[in-house]
């Protein structure tokens, strides 16, 4: 069915805007978040400038250097929940930006800049009966229509319902879907943060194992050089394979989060549509998209201990004639034995006193 459009004034919902503004206040400066907005591991948000100020206050030594920005690691506590936030070498610039909050701020500022009485309410008019407004909803055809169409027109044999009833029902359904989607986004964000930490742990463990490997090979003669290169390559391949897998998962989760955030933004904008008929023309499609997005199954996470590189530990207590058979010993921590500065092995521990294996 085709419709024509008429207009009449509509008041804005100032109460909803006030409630939204309260959710966009930074707990430090007590002002609306200023970009960039960063999300802490505890899922609270701060202006990046405010996060930097909190860090400086918690670390007087940094202030004594005359620095106004943080360029390496440190820690501070979240002002909302007191959770300790540990920074990497990038400082507060290593904290992830919350693009969803930034987008909501932009939408809020755009909406709040409009006069409350400047909007016009659109009334869809029935094309079949030009003087009749669209005021009922055909449940059989799932389209808005007018009363005369029900009495005399194409929908006289259809089941209908009042337009406000269907409007409230579908708006409630979309609102519930958005809530589920936002909750899912929070879980995805937490998983991404966890997997980024896994990447860092893999890199740290790999770096530590490489250092141990180099220290031990440096104490041996030239015959070890070829074998050392082979083992380093094996370790590097394993590191790269693990990092590629985890980073691939991060990309998948990130793509899902981006698509979900865009859908949330689109749904929020749709819910702000004050006209029931206009809203209902697009609500069904949005509801289906939100439902489908909330049911998407994401790829699994790395299994527990996936970041471990302990299987690349090397012992140097083997006899010289067996040097070319040295290989990694999975499960060995690589921390029991020490190499003396002159190249001689340190005091043997319980494992080193055992006879060499075959």
UniProtKB/Swiss-Prot annotation:
Q: Gene Ontology cellular component?
A: cytoplasm; microtubule; microtubule associated complex; Z disc
Zn-finger (B box-type) intervals are: 121-163
Expression by tissue: Specifically expressed in heart and skeletal muscle.
- For the ligand (Zn(2+)), the binding residues are 126, 129, 149, 155
The annotated subunit structure for this chain is: Homooligomer and heterooligomer. Interacts with tubulin. Interacts with TRIM63 and probably with TRIM55.
Gene encoding this polypeptide?
Answer: TRIM54
The organism is Homo sapiens (Human)
Primary site of residence: cytoplasm
- Give all cystine bridges in this chain: none
Biased-composition ranges, Acidic residues, are 334-345
Q: Which UniProt keywords apply?
A: Coiled coil, Cytoplasm, Cytoskeleton, Developmental protein, Differentiation, Metal-binding, Microtubule, Zinc, Zinc-finger
What name does this protein carry? Tripartite motif-containing protein 54
Q: Where is this region: Disordered?
A: 326-358
Q: Name one GO molecular function term.
A: ubiquitin protein ligase activity
Entry's localization field: Cytoplasm, Cytoskeleton; Cytoplasm, Myofibril, Sarcomere, Z line
